[in-house]
């Protein structure tokens, strides 16, 4: 049975390197499923929960991906992301604190009507919520 080789790479190194039968990612245009034999492509990714169905019914892995790009070349899938964490590596307490900080920063930015700070806080909040969601899986 054909399978994908999936690597998730960040500036800190390889975060995930396994075989899979299916991966699901989210682009600005919506969700995309990648199966073995998928057409070659390069696409941008948004902050999302990447679902990886391991080969031979070995289970499902979840990875919190914070933007980046996906490249599919034959059956090799490479995700290059700003940051990424596997569900088992996420410290939920730390993620909750990051969410609270982002909420406070967003509230402050809205009060002062600072658009740049508001956007940064919104991104930080999306990332924290994504990490919490993946960490609970």
Curated annotation (Swiss-Prot):
Intracellular or extracellular location(s): Cell membrane
UniProt main location, coarse: membrane
InterPro entries per the UniProt record, alphabetical: ATP_F1_dsu/esu_C_sf (IPR036794), ATP_synth_F1_dsu/esu (IPR001469), ATP_synth_F1_dsu/esu_N (IPR020546), ATP_synth_F1_esu_C (IPR020547), ATPsynth_dsu/esu_N (IPR036771)
Gene Ontology molecular-function annotations: ATP binding; proton-transporting ATP synthase activity, rotational mechanism
Keywords carried by this UniProt record: ATP synthesis, Cell membrane, CF(1), Hydrogen ion transport, Ion transport, Membrane, Transport
GO cellular component, one term: plasma membrane
Top-level lineage group: Bacteria
CDD domains: F1-ATPase_delta (cd12152)
Protein's membrane topology: Peripheral membrane protein
Subunit structure: F-type ATPases have 2 components, CF(1) - the catalytic core - and CF(0) - the membrane proton channel. CF(1) has five subunits: alpha(3), beta(3), gamma(1), delta(1), epsilon(1). CF(0) has three main subunits: a, b and c.
Protein family (similarity comment): Belongs to the ATPase epsilon chain family.
Matching NCBIfam families: ATP_synt_epsi, PRK00571.1-3
Chain's role: Produces ATP from ADP in the presence of a proton gradient across the membrane.
Name listed for the protein in its UniProt record: ATP synthase epsilon chain
Organism: Streptococcus agalactiae serotype III (strain NEM316)
Gene it is expressed from: atpC
């Amino acid at each position: 049975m054909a399978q994908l080789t999936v690597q998730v790479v960040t500036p800190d190194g390889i975060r995930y390197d396994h075989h899979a039968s299916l991966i699901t990612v989210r682009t600005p245009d919506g969700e995309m499923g990648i199966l073995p034999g998928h057409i070659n492509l390069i696409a941008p990714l948004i902050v999302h929960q990447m679902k990886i169905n391991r080969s031979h019914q070995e289970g499902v892995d979840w990875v919190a991906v914070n933007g980046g790009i996906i490249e599919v070349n034959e059956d090799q899938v490479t995700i290059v992301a700003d940051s990424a964490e596997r569900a088992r590596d996420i410290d939920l307490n730390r993620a909750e604190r990051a969410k609270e900080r982002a909420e406070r920063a967003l509230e402050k930015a809205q009060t002062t009507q600072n658009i740049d700070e508001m956007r940064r806080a919104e991104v930080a909040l999306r990332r924290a919520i994504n990490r919490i969601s993946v960490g609970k899986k």
